[in-house]
Amino acid sequence: MKLCGFEVGLDQPLFLIAGPCVIESMQLQLDTAGKLKEVTDRLGVNFIFKSSFDKANRTSGTAFRGPGMEEGLKVLAEVKKQIGVPVLTDVHEYTPMDEVASVVDVLQTPAFLVRQTDFIRKVCSAGKPVNIKKGQFLAPWDMKPVVEKAKATGNEQIMVCERGASFGYNNLVSDMRSLAVMRDTGCPVVFDATHSVQLPGGQGTSSGGQREHVPVLARAAVAVGISGLFAETHPDPSKALSDGPNAWPLDQMEALLETLMELDAVTKKHGFSRFA
């Protein structure tokens, strides 16, 4: 599949979707995108910048949600212009898709909305590649009907994203088998290494996270074989306005990516058919 000018798939190198969880300010987005571009250029990694203009599913009703669509799109447009990278953002049921699609390169559907048929069709009809996040409550094989709904719109540029499965209360686990199962959708599979270590609602009025396990799960996913890695990152996760406990520090992204690209090359060198 062609995505933002480059090919993605199990026969292609790992690509990266990364950025802060939510748009906090113009300068933070530009600085983070600029640093990520430096790192990915150095390592030869295809990179898409991500950040959200509205986090509609915050634990607390008073938590920071973002600057809103109008201001958020201005920031993302400036990132594209100044840094020269493609951009991705989430959309919601109320989002004017055409307006967002006029700025961003990739649309993303929140995990909680994966079963909303009309929403999935609406997003996939906007004429942009779509990253569909698997719900924490959904089995990996249940992504097949979701993809069928998506592709029925005529959009063939669909990716599926694993972000962990609910395991009891306030906890997620990552079943690496799901990455192989979701290949049966015929779509590139992306692994979300940072939301997978989230502890949803684990801090009472906000979600916790186990950031130290990001490299563990990322390496495991790359060893299984994935097309892309999704990772939220921040210059200072302790001060992030959303999902700080599971965000990976920006200054540690290069070391992590370097390891992952080496693993990716070995995994894809040996192929997958003989293990099927």
From Swiss-Prot:
Q: What InterPro entries has UniProt attached to this entry?
A: Aldolase_TIM, DAHP1/KDSA, KDO8P_synthase
Location relative to the cell: Cytoplasm
Q: Which gene encodes it?
A: kdsA
Family, as annotated:
Belongs to the KdsA family.
- NCBIfam families, A to Z: KDO8P_synth (TIGR01362), PRK05198.1 (NF003543)
Main EC class the enzyme belongs to: transferase
What's the protein called, per UniProt? Answer: 2-dehydro-3-deoxyphosphooctonate aldolase
* Presence of keyword Cytoplasm: yes
Q: Which GO terms describe its biological process?
A: keto-3-deoxy-D-manno-octulosonic acid biosynthetic process
Keyword Cytoplasm on this protein? yes
Signal peptide per UniProt: none
One Gene Ontology molecular-function label: 3-deoxy-8-phosphooctulonate synthase activity
The protein's Enzyme Commission number: 2.5.1.55
Gene3D superfamilies reported for this sequence: Aldolase class I (3.20.20.70)
Catalytic activity reads: D-arabinose 5-phosphate + phosphoenolpyruvate + H2O = 3-deoxy-alpha-D-manno-2-octulosonate-8-phosphate + phosphate
